[in-house]
Curated annotation (Swiss-Prot):
Keywords: Acyltransferase, Lipid biosynthesis, Lipid metabolism, Membrane, Phospholipid biosynthesis, Phospholipid metabolism, Transferase, Transmembrane, Transmembrane helix. Its EC number is 2.3.1.15. This is Probable glycerol-3-phosphate acyltransferase 8. It comes from the Eukaryota. CDD domains: LPLAT (cd06551). The HXXXXD motif is essential for acyltransferase activity and may constitute the binding site for the phosphate moiety of the glycerol-3-phosphate. One of its GO terms (molecular function) is glycerol-3-phosphate O-acyltransferase activity. It comes from Arabidopsis thaliana (Mouse-ear cress). Esterifies acyl-group from acyl-ACP to the sn-1 position of glycerol-3-phosphate, an essential step in glycerolipid biosynthesis.
Amino acid sequence: MSPEKKSQNFPPITECRDGEYDSIAADLDGTLLLSRSSFPYFMLVAVEAGSLLRGLILLLSLPFVIISYLFVSESLGIQILIFISFAGLKIRDIELVSRAVLPRFYAADVRKDSFEVFDKCKRKVVVTANPIVMVEAFVKDYLGGDKVLGTEIEVNPKTNRATGFVKKPGVLVGDLKRLAILKEFGNESPDLGLGDRTSDHDFMSLCKKGYMVHATKSATTIPKERLKNRIVFHDGRLAQRPTPLNAIITYLWLPFGFILSIIRVYFNLPLPERFVRYTYEMLGIHLTIRGHRPPPPSPGTLGNLYVLNHRTALDPIIVAIALGRKICCVTYSVSRLSLMLSPIPAVALTRDRATDAANMRKLLEKGDLVICPEGTTCREEYLLRFSALFAELSDRIVPVAMNCKQGMFNGTTVRGVKFWDPYFFFMNPRPSYEATFLDRLPEEMTVNGGGKTPIEVANYVQKVIGAVLGFECTELTRKDKYLLLGGNDGKVESINNTKK
């Protein structure tokens, strides 16, 4: 490979013909991704690994970043983004956000024509000015990349926190990208080079063929199904991609949204459930109820066991509102404060199978009971594996399909403080909830009446709920979710130890 090879004019990606290519070196922002700006992803790191205040500081610094980028150097502009977003953060928190938050937003921004070229190559290398720690998980797990050549951030070895500065040779732009390709490939030139700006010409000139990825209105993103892995789990409070405009709107709405969420929570708290359905609409919360709602149990008979898929912590409350009466629910983890503020009785499970079964049978003797056998929430259109314990408790099983829409904030979290979940949900300008009551399980599909095994009943309930919602049923569990998003097994003790 000749380091003296001059830069040249490269043809557009549309002229790249199908062929056998062993290796490729491609830029990320504006090349494999539709957007040329990495600001939204730095904003996500600043907010989700840091705080809303850090995100605000980053947003206010954007004019200075743009001026530095355009009139001083590309390197300086990116260095400012890195310093404000990363300085003082634990490297573990940055890694978790890169694995749990960023992939969902990156996945929605993958450019179709460049990814199709990238995907056909055997050896795939991404060369980017972004910090490696920020993009490596997505590139390898979802784009199928083999290596990421990017900017390395400096970490204080004593505290394991990012200093905000970068390691030598600095931010990977221009000639530094060329040197990184030389070091990675040696004398064997990459077959293809893809870039979107003139500063990419340095490394593209080393490739046997190079193509420019121009910003065009006709450019489209690929369906998420085309990625190497599906995105089932993700974390983070921000529901929409924080472009500068979205970020400004979010911060302007934040104080009003917080006040509105307090009103929405505490105004409805003392009201009877049969009235709350109407006050929700008054306060901008859209509630849709479908299906036949069973009447309360007769004295001396067991209550109905309402089996729900789990979208947010509000699921049991929405069912109580739909029924127009108080019903008890069981939950896997709940704070004392949340128990005090809950408008319906809530009982924490012990995770001891025999103890939990005995407690739930006692609750059913007193009346109706709500349970979410997935054990944790799932934001995407998937259902996790249903724990079969509920099928052993009663034959009076009523499946309920739950769904909700959140435009600005997510009302669930893995790494954050769960107490704030309902408040973030109600901070959305126009949140909506849907509850669809299905027919009670026929006797032949129960354990006692039909001779089915608990697992068969659980799988059947998962299937009928999934069919109504159009969700895919999976074998994934709470443990799978927390291992991916939080780096622990999902047990309360493990979660607390991780946060220390």
